[in-house]
Every structure is written in C-alpha cells, then in structure tokens.
A protein has these predicted regions:
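Intrinsically disordered, low-complexity regions enriched in acidic/Ser/Thr/Pro/Gln residues
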Residues: 1-155, 160-162
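General beta-strand structural signal in soluble alpha/beta enzymes
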Residues: 162-163, 193, 214-215, 234-237
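Extracellular/luminal Protease-associated
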Residues: 182-219, 227
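Glycine- and Gly-Pro-enriched alpha-helical subdomains that act as flexible
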Residues: 142-191, 195
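Short, solvent-exposed amphipathic alpha-helical segments in soluble enzyme
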Residues: 44-45, 54-55, 168-170, 178-181, ...
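C-terminal binding/interaction regions
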Residues: 222-253
C-alpha cells in the first residue's frame, strides 16, 4: 500500500487527509528465456502467482515441472525454467480476460466444456457456505484499508489458503499456486472468489478439478454454461443466509 494526501468531500465539507491506496506493478514472466506475458498485479506472493498462472494456463502439469523460479523486484520480472507441456503455437493465441488488471489466458475457456467432467461425491451442507463466505469477505486487511483488491480462497480439511490481488484471476492463481506447492487435494476443496464469476475464473477452477466455486457476486452466462457442462457446483450471491445455485446442486445437502 502507498499513502497519498487527498481531499475528502463529505456532505459538502472538504478535509485534507491521508489515504491508503493499493499498489499495482507490471510483472513480466520470462519462460525458458522467452518473454511470455506481463501481468498487472499486486506486489505480493509473486512466486505463487507465477506458479498458479503457468498451471492454470496449461504450461505445466505440476509444480515440480519448474526447475528454477526467481523474481527480480527491482525490474519486476519473473524468470522461470520449466518443462513445458504446452504447444508452442498456442503462445500466439492470447485472450485478454474480463478481469481487473487486463489478464491474459492462452486458451479459450469454452474449450474446457469439451474436456472436463467432474465426478460426484463431494458434498457440503448449505449452512457451511454462509459461514465460509462471512469469514471470507471480512478476512482481507488490504481491502479494509484500501477497498482496492479482490480475494480468493481454497478451503479444505487441512485449512484455508487465502490470497489478495487487484485482479480476481490473479488472486485465484496465487491461491492455486500455493496449493500446488503444498500438494493439497484439489478435488476436496471449495473455492471462494469475490466479485463477478466469468468464464476464465471457472476454467481455472476446472483446470484444478475443484468441484465447488462460490462467490458473493454474479456469474456470466458462459460461466454458468461451462459449470453445468462440467458438473461443477457454482454458487453466486452468497450473502447472509441466501445464495443462488447455478449448477451442481446435488453437492449441497
């Protein structure tokens, strides 16, 4: 965070005050000596962000595929050596996402519908989601101070991975990146995200085979279609004691 002296106007009264503003940096990822992408992101958990981004973009199958990862915070560059499983020609098919920070993905999220079908078996009581979301939306100290970040969390029996970033997709990649390195069982996790759920958010969740995604906000039509085709549980507007179930209601008992 960085503090600025600003003028606050409330009910016609002007006041000079200090205001905390969230930080934004351009992180350029260099993969095996070639510049891959520049992510506009918050300057924290950058190694987790890189690991999660490479995984959800399909460049690798596990964290151990990375043989070297260093982040230069003076130049805001991440240098990655990795055993890549992605066809090189797809590098020219960048898709700019709808999320904050002008994110990039290297596949069409609609293609996920043709490849992933989640198994049944994982269930949770509806009341549990209300408790999870209540704690989730009050967990971000950065949001409390700046109002300028999104959050994502992975919740399972082993605990919670919680991350902030100015972009929803970045926050999710950070959580996934840490989960990969801790080798958590993604198939037994619930993913939480703040704000709108678009197709690329659902695609990242399905890449990990996570069965449940819940948000305090709304999904897009493509997010709902992908979730239904993949048998994923998608919850929106989880607030107070209510929620909308857009797909996969069989997992809520």
């Amino acid at each position: 965070m960085e503090n600025f002296v600003i003028t606050s106007i409330r009910q016609g009264v002007r006041e000079e005050k200090s205001d905390a503003v969230t930080e934004e940096v351009p992180l350029t990822i260099e993969l095996n000596g070639t510049e891959l992408a520049t992510l506009l992101c918050s300057p924290s958990d950058l190694k987790n962000l890189v690991v999660g981004f490479l995984y959800t973009s399909g460049f690798m199958e596990e964290a151990s595929s990375i043989t070297s990862l260093t982040v230069d915070q003076d130049r805001w560059k991440a240098y990655v050596d990795c055993v890549v499983t992605f066809p090189s020609e797809v590098l020219f098919k960048r898709i700019y996402t709808s999320g904050c920070g002008k994110g990039i993905i290297f596949h069409n999220p609609l293609d996920v519908m043709q490849r992933v079908r989640l198994a049944d078996g994982f269930t949770l009581a509806g009341e549990q989601f209300f408790g999870m979301m209540k704690k989730f939306i009050t967990s971000s100290e950065e949001f409390r101070l700046t109002g300028g970040v999104h959050s994502a969390a992975l919740i399972g029996d082993a605990g919670t991975i919680f991350k902030d970033d100015l972009g929803r997709h970045n926050a999710l990649d950070k959580a996934i990146g840490e989960g990969l390195q801790k080798k958590i069982d993604f198939s037994a996790q619930v993913a939480l995200t703040s704000g709108r759920v678009s197709s690329e958010i659902v695609a990242k969740i399905l890449r990990c085979q996570i069965p449940v995604l819940a948000s305090s906000g709304a999904p897009t039509n493509q997010a709902v279609k992908i979730a239904r085709e993949a048998n994923m549980t998608l919850l929106g507007f989880v607030r107070g004691q209510r929620m909308n179930v857009y797909s996969g209601e069989q997992r809520i008992v």
